[in-house]
């Protein structure tokens, strides 16, 4: 049974990350983590006619790859905890609509992957699920449309505007233990920190204080 120590939850079952997958676009493939991705794509439209559908394809591919690498069947996955940067988490819902796996939509902006891992681990700890997936996605072009200006508008980006990743990541978490796989033994959920950042383009500055403020 999980135990609380201050604001930290200690997980007795230590859910194990038995597989993971990451896919990304051209720009990400050229960065320092380029060789770490399972797949990268020169064409970031993913053959789709809008950016939201492109992001959907990224998440779908990441989840399918992670499940395949886990040697599990989709019927063995109890639930998927996933989210993205789009309204109503449509990237997640459209990616999962043909998989027939129970799903929970989550929204934590740039913390969605960490949030999905936390909730997934708690679901294993509860005994309700045996094997679940945690996933998230984003796409530079759909994020610009959602939070700044559509690329078609041709607006000039400010120097403080971050570049949102085009990619998706997924992890399969299980109650099964492995001597070589990482596991989740503690989770710590953060609080809202508002430092009064007024530059709407500089989302990184608004989020950074939460990353550095750790309380026992």
PLM region descriptions:
Residues 1-50, 149-216:
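Condensing-enzyme catalytic core mediating Claisen C-C bond formation in acyl metabolism
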Residues 18, 83, 132-138, 173:
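Short beta-strand segments
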Residues 33-36, 92-102, 124-126, 147-156:
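A glycine- and small-aliphatic-rich helix-loop capping segment at beta-alpha/alpha-beta transitions
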Residues 89-90, 140-145, 191-197:
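Short, well-ordered, mixed-charge alpha-helical segments that flank or form enzyme active sites
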Residues 23, 82-88, 138-139, 178:
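Short glycine-enriched loops at secondary-structure junctions
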